[in-house]
A protein has these predicted regions:
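Short, basic and Ser/Thr-rich N-terminal targeting/leader segments
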Residues: 78, 103-105, 175, 184, ...
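N-terminal lobe of the biotin/lipoate ligase/transferase fold
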Residues: 2-164
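Long, positively charged amphipathic alpha-helical accessory segments at protein N-termini or as interdomain linkers
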Residues: 1-28, 42-43, 147, 153-171, ...
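Structural motif
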Residues: 81-82, 106-108, 133, 172, ...
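Short loop/edge segments at beta-strand edges and connector loops
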Residues: 86, 173-175
């Protein structure tokens, strides 16, 4: 009902709509219409009202509501089922539950705020209300489980290409899937697979993008290591950023389903800020220092250490050393 009231106001943008007309069209009382108007105002919609003239929509908040996204999203699959919440503990937890209940491929779970967002290596992810894109995507690919880890590289490629379209051409990928701008982290990606040794049941891809956060709003421990689109002087509505990202993710994913991961891995190499750099890798049980030379066909990082041997890194935390 609230969406219907909002749509009435949108259709008459710049003009007034009477409460009586809306109540008759929606088959509810004028008091009910007023309550919906009040609720919309509380969500940030600027609606003015005058006796005998009705209501007029002046400005909409930058919310990721289903109605806002439905108007602009041009994907075929991603986001066709769109689960939206004001707040949740974690979109990955919500998406995992939906996937276990049989939610279709392309289901998007998005929230305005996460209470317990998670990144790689079980780290927390700062997810304040209305400041970023905090969402998870359900995938049901038909490739073998051994290929699943490369989905995280695929996502990093898609998001980086989307940022370039927004004008943020300095965005690049630190292995495996952190997206950095001048050394500061813009995006976190967490991919979780469920299935057997032979078959993938589903993949839940959790993504956090800092969009509107300002430097002074960051927690003290993030001030020197995090960034946002706003901090990089990219002025974009969250809905538009989300549209570009979902469309790029869908395009990249179906390219992989059609043709495999080879081209995506080549694109990853081109967008990497890791390859060719001196790095330190903290891998399970070992720490290595050397030069990142390439990724292999499985997306693992190849590092040439001081004695000339090549170490293959399957999992670990990479730090890029400043150039001398």
């Amino acid at each position: 009902m609230r969406d219907e009231v909002l749509e009435f106001l949108r259709q008459n943008q710049g003009g007034f709509v009477s409460g009586q007309d809306m109540s008759e069209a929606c088959h509810v009382s004028r008091t009910a219409i007023w309550k919906h108007i009040k609720a919309l105002r509380q969500k940030g919609y600027k609606i003015e009202s005058y006796t005998k003239r009705g209501y007029r929509l002046l400005e909409e908040p930058d919310l990721l509501s289903p109605l806002a996204m439905k108007q602009i999203l041009k994907t075929d699959v991603f986001g066709k089922r769109y689960v939206y919440m004001d707040t949740t503990e974690s979109t990955n937890l919500e998406a995992r539950y939906l996937a276990q209940q049989g939610a279709e491929e392309g289901t998007v779970v998005v929230t305005e705020e996460q209470a317990a967002g998670r990144g790689r290596l079980s780290r927390g992810w700062y997810s304040p209300f209305g400041k970023g894109l905090w969402f998870s995507l359900i995938l049901r690919p038909d490739f073998p489980p051994v290929e699943a880890p490369k989905c995280t590289l695929m996502a990093a490629v898609a998001l980086t290409k989307a940022f370039h379209k927004m004008g943020l051409t300095d965005a690049g990928i630190k292995w495996p899937n952190d997206i950095l701008v001048n050394g500061r982290k813009l995006v976190g990606i967490l991919t979780e697979m469920s299935g057997s040794m032979e078959e993938i049941s589903h993949i839940v891809m959790g993504i956090g993008v800092n969009v509107k956060t300002k430097q002074e709003e960051l927690p003290e421990e993030l001030k020197l290591i995090a960034t946002s689109l706003a901090m990089e002087d990219i002025d974009i509505e969250r809905t538009e950023a989300f549209r570009l990202i979902l469309e790029e993710l869908e395009h990249q994913y179906y390219e992989v389903l059609d043709s495999g991961f080879d081209e995506t891995l080549n694109e990853w190499r081109q967008l990497s800020v890791t390859l060719g750099e001196e790095i330190e890798v903290r891998a399970p049980g070992n720490t290595y220092e050397g030069v990142a030379t390439d990724i292999d066909e499985d997306g693992n990082l190849l590092v040439r250490i001081s004695d000339g041997t090549i170490k293959r890194i399957v999992a670990g935390d990479v730090s890029i050393r400043p150039r001398k």
